[in-house]
Amino acid sequence: MKKYPEKIVVAWGEAISGNLEIRDWLMKNNYPELGLFCHALYFDKSASDWLMKHAPHLLATIKGVEGKKDAIRWLEINGFKLLAKVAKAADNDKEQMHWLMLNDKLFGVLAQRIKLVKDDIEEANNDVHRWGYE
């Protein structure tokens, strides 16, 4: 994975949490993969297609968060062990979250933010009051 400056990882976390201004800044300032990751989290097909071509490790991270074991294996086999841990942690693996918080807090916080987004999406999908209104 490309080595990102700490402030860019922090910005990515903010974008994941819904800061559209920062997401758009990432897109325009040589970090389109991080901005498109945010779109792909919300099932944007064109963003997922772009990630598949240009940053498959980020798409595999999203798929791993969604519980796809083959995506986690792909990350581990291809040298993206940290992203595999992020995906597992964001998919409710407490042991991986604990490891991240002890060993790479920046990516631990990133995993927490991804988990919150995915939990919100799942809650909305399960809310019978919202069915048919989106």
Predicted regions, residues:
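Ankyrin repeat (ANK) tandem alpha-helical domains that serve as protein-protein interaction scaffolds
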Residues: 1-134
